[in-house]
């Protein structure tokens, strides 16, 4: 009887009740090496406190400032609170993916690692504001690494 009670208690704590998904469209600033507009989207799914996300973003080059364009796609693992606390759901994430950087005729592409975090703020119903910081370490041939990005976006939870 005690083993059954312990097993049921354990399964109740670790088994996900329901998966949640969300999509974010964002705009922000890439601060490396100069401030330039960046934009993109992210699609994710969460299971209690662990989530998975795919993101794509792009930043245009500024030849006069010597700032390369940067495009990347990244898969990440998120650790987040299972529910919003006072309308705020903080998260931490880390991931890896591929990037492409270009400045004039010079191009570089390769593997990138990203780490960051942020908060999803409840607005109305399933609509949330997402604020995020990301540090992205690019390959050894990159002109500007690590890249730092700050953004805000509209997030729809479903």
Label every model-predicted segment.
Residues 5-14:
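Sec-dependent N-terminal signal peptides
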Residues 36-41, 74:
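Short amphipathic alpha-helical segment that frequently serves as the phosphate-/nucleotide-binding helix
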Residues 44-113, 121-125, 129, 150-158:
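Gram-negative (and chloroplast) outer-membrane scaffold detector with strong preference
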Residues 140-145:
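A short acidic/glycine-rich loop-to-helix N-cap element
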Residues 22-37:
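Short N-terminal segments immediately surrounding and downstream of signal-peptide cleavage
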Residues 15-21:
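Sec/Tat signal peptide C-region and signal peptidase I cleavage site
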């Amino acid at each position: 009887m005690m083993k059954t009670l312990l097993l049921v208690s354990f399964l109740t704590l670790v088994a996900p009740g329901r998966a949640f998904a969300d999509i974010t469209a964002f705009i922000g600033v890439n601060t490396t090496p100069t401030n330039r507009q960046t934009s993109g989207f992210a699609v994710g799914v969460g299971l209690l406190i662990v989530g998975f996300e795919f993101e794509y973003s792009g930043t245009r080059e500024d030849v006069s400032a010597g700032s390369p364009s940067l495009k990347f796609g990244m898969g990440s693992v998120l650790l987040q609170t299972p529910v919003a606390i006072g309308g705020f759901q903080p998260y931490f994430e880390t991931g890896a993916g591929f990037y492409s950087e270009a400045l004039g005729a010079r191009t570089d592409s390769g593997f990138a690692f990203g780490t960051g975090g942020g908060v999803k703020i409840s607005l109305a119903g399933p609509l949330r504001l997402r604020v995020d910081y990301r540090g992205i370490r690019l390959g050894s041939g990159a002109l500007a690494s690590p890249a730092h990005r700050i953004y805000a976006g509209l997030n729809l939870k479903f």
